[in-house]
Amino acid sequence: EIEPIDNSYNVIMTQGKVEFGDIIDGKNLDRLVSALGIDNDDLIKEAPVQIVSTGHSKVMIGIKDYKQLHNLRPDMKELNKLSDIINCNGYFVFTFDSKEKDILLKGRMFAPAIGIEEDPVTGNANGPVGAYIVKYNLVKIENDNLNFSAKQGMSIDREGTINVNVHIENSEPVKVQVSGTATVVF
């Protein structure tokens, strides 16, 4: 869906079926945190590292601290090797440590296995993280929808905001939509 707004557009994308894949643990988790340059203690303990998909699977990795998120310098070769082992090509590292009242989380998405060292803003990561937040009750949800905004791209000077709407039935995420403002630049 595309809605014109002034000199730009609001683009809304309904994502595919929500699917929860493997939890990454043991040696693969150790390899992952090492490749990211973090420790297991940096992870949000209530948020298991897990593959989640709404069309394109990503590994969800919740960490406690924004400064650490901002300063990540992943070992892309190691992430690439790990992608072959776990059958997932993207890693979405996020934190709820946001000083901005309208921004629930900030994230970074790495996918070196498909030639993307860092994606500045991606619905293919923020959509699944919305479903993941619902599944693990990581934030308070008061009705049948979770609506939030997330930021990405700050660490590579290509900042953008994405809006996420998760429809919930029987406490489970059933439909995810992402939206944001797009501007034609050519």
Residue spans for each PLM region:
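Acidic, low-complexity central loop/insert segments
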Residues: 1-81, 134-186
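Glycine-rich, charge-dense phosphate/pyrophosphate-binding loop(s)
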Residues: 72, 85-159
